[in-house]
Curated annotation (Swiss-Prot):
Organism of provenance: Rattus norvegicus
Protein name, as recorded: Tryptophan--tRNA ligase, cytoplasmic
UniProt family annotation: Belongs to the class-I aminoacyl-tRNA synthetase family.
Quaternary structure and interacting proteins, as annotated: Homodimer. Interacts with oxidized form of GAPDH.
N6-succinyllysine modification, residue list: K158
Function noted in UniProt: Catalyzes the attachment of tryptophan to tRNA(Trp) in a two-step reaction: tryptophan is first activated by ATP to form Trp-AMP and then transferred to the acceptor end of the tRNA(Trp). Could also possess an angiostatic activity.
Length: 481
């Protein structure tokens, strides 16, 4: 694929070999113990992904009992090489053994994207005339593909549009789910462009133990939370895959074109699919790719095929869009541009991202003030010392403290955040005080969101989800003849 990283692997082959052996043992033990099918399939996917990484690094297939030589470049006892092998990121799994979380600099190299640097942030500020969002200022959105092309288009008064999405797997969304929508709302405001939001209820039906009716009902409930973020109904189209596929021939035609240009071998290598996966899973990446092309939305862009889109998303979704970027020029479309965010850590620590399937790892948008306080106090991983005396003497570690991490996402004032960092690091602020600060930020944030959501009616949802013409700044440029 054109956009796959081509540099040297960041992983020690010996460490990767050992990981494959250990994962193989896990798969065998799960099968022998008659573990749930989903658990076995997840383990098998991880095994195949590890083997693919090994083949890329070594140029040959993994062979059990035949470890690579220990003199491979990059091993040499380098702790960074070992750490890289312990970071695992794909669209379904995020895992690291480091309490600091994923090494995003190495992930940029691994995925072949570009770092969002100060120069790019300054250019965004000049183009929009607006102060950069805190997610940009603090490196929460840290990586991109072709953002300079988007800015070129904007500065030359050429149109582009935003595309993001949500896989609705439960009625309640959590704080981590808010991150891309908060940022996308800011992008919509400062660039004054249309936005399409894909609700991939078909994906959740294929991957989860859900009925079609349940998957669609989650779409409607999640759409209410998304609308409550403040999107402009005149510039925003939210669509259900289950619903829109039958309403838009242009959308389905793009899905079929993508399917024709991507082989099973490619998607197996990208996503780790196995022979036991249903064909719906294998073909789904084309459905997630299709909104990247403007003529998938004829009510908005008519038959224009040349309007580029910008996709804000977490970096675990990048494999879908590396595939999309490879296909785009072959079917007559510009490559989508991307802005990648870091992961929102679980309460228990940055080794994994927040998950809706674990209520103790997540703060939900439906939680009460009492529940928020209890979860932060009981479950938020602390970077503090074992005793007050030690903490006062040596200070806390903000790099692993979840409460501080959450404040970097949600506390707007940079000076206040920096003062908290200094106080906690010096020992002047205790863990309990830091957690109280976070609670004082989260409780009103979620209460205000709940109030906005309560005002979202079924009619409001229908209005956002109706295929229709949108109103936006560059509309006249889209339809000039």
């Amino acid at each position: 694929m054109a956009d796959m990283p081509s540099g040297e692997s960041c992983t020690s082959p010996l460490e990767l070999f050992n990981s494959i052996a250990a994962q193989g043992e896990l798969v065998r033990s799960l099968k022998a113990g008659n573990a749930p099918k989903d658990e076995i399939e997840s383990a098998v996917k991880m095994l195949l992904s590890l083997k693919m990484n090994y083949k890329t690094a070594m140029g040959e297939e993994y062979k059990a009992g035949c470890p690579p030589g220990n003199s491979t470049a990059g091993s040499n006892g380098d702790p960074d090489a070992t750490k890289a092998s312990e970071d695992f990121v794909d669209p379904w799994t995020v895992r690291t053994s480091s309490a600091k979380g994923i090494d995003y600099d190495k992930l940029i190299v691994q995925f072949g994207s570009s770092k969002i640097d100060k120069e790019l942030i300054n250019r965004i500020e000049r183009a929009t005339g607006q102060r950069p969002h805190r997610f940009l200022r603090r490196g929460i959105f840290f990586s991109h593909r072709d953002m300079n092309q988007i800015l070129d288009a904007y500065e030359n008064k050429k149109p582009f549009y935003l595309y993001t999405g949500r896989g609705p797997s439960s009625e309640a969304m959590h704080l981590g789910h808010l991150v891309p929508f908060i940022f996308t709302k800011w992008l919509q405001d400062v660039f004054d462009v249309p936005l399409v939001i894909q609700m991939s209820d078909d994906e959740k039906y294929l991957w989860k133990d859900l009925t079609l009716e349940q998957a669609y009902s989650y779409t409607v409930e999640n759409a209410k939370d998304i609308i409550a973020c403040g999107f402009d109904v005149n510039k925003t189209f939210i669509f259900s895959d289950l619903e829109y596929m039958g309403q838009s021939p242009g959308f389905y035609k793009n899905v079929v074109k993508i399917q024709k240009h991507v082989t099973f071998n490619q998607v197996k290598g990208i996503f780790g699919f196995t022979d036991s996966d249903c064909i719906g899973k294998i073909s789904f990446p084309a459905v997630q790719a299709a909104p990247s092309f403007s003529n998938s939305f004829p009510k908005i862009f008519r038959d224009r095929t040349d309007i580029q889109c910008l996709i804000p998303c977490a970096i675990d979704q990048d494999p879908y869009f590396r595939m999309t970027r490879d296909v785009a020029p072959r079917i007559g479309h510009p490559k989508p541009a991307l802005l990648h965010s870091t992961f929102f850590p679980a309460l228990q620590g940055a080794q994994t991202k927040m998950s809706a399937s674990d209520p103790n790892s997540s703060i939900f948008l439906t939680d009460t003030a009492k529940q928020i306080k209890s979860k932060v106090n009981k479950h938020a991983f602390s970077g503090g010392r074992d005793t007050v005396e030690e903490h006062r003497q040596f200070g806390g570690n903000c790099e692993v403290d979840v409460s501080f991490m959450y404040l970097t996402f949600f506390l707007e004032d940079d000076d206040s955040l920096e003062q908290i960092r200094k106080d906690y690091t010096s020992g002047a602020m205790l863990t309990g005080e830091l957690k109280k600060t976070l609670i004082d930020v989260l409780q009103p944030l979620i209460a205000e969101h709940q109030a906005r959501r309560k005002a979202v009616t079924e009619e409001t949802v229908k209005e956002f989800m109706a295929p229709r013409q949108l109103s936006f700044h560059f509309q006249c440029f889209c339809f000039d003849t």
